[in-house]
UniProtKB/Swiss-Prot annotation:
Modified residues (Lysine amide): 84
Domain LCN-type CS-alpha/beta: 21-83
UniProt name for this protein: Toxin TdNa7
Segment forming the signal sequence: 1-20
UniProt subcellular location: Secreted
Length: 86
């Protein structure tokens, strides 16, 4: 019984450490990756290429992805460089 409790504790600890992020994909220009004029599966395919679990074209007409690795750059309001002429 003690081993089982220890196993469960380790399992939950690993689950808490290995987190994935969700967010809008960011293009090379620093803007959200648009999906307005693209095929319906564009966002899901693009998210998969970046090792995300799934994705869709959100109401803001930008690709939103789930469960992506931390190395994938996502758009954030605080670090927004879109339209600022780098």
């Amino acid at each position: 019984m003690t081993r089982f409790v220890l196993f469960l504790s380790c399992f939950f600890l690993i689950g808490m450490v290995v987190e994935c992020k969700d967010g809008y994909l960011m293009g090379p220009d620093g803007c959200k990756l648009d999906c307005l004029m693209r095929k319906g599966t564009f966002c899901a395919e693009t998210c998969s290429l970046r090792k995300g679990k799934d994705g869709y074209c959100y109401a803001w007409l930008a690709c939103y992805c789930y469960n992506m690795p931390d190395w994938v750059k996502t758009w954030e309001r605080a670090t927004n460089t879109c339209g600022k002429g780098k």
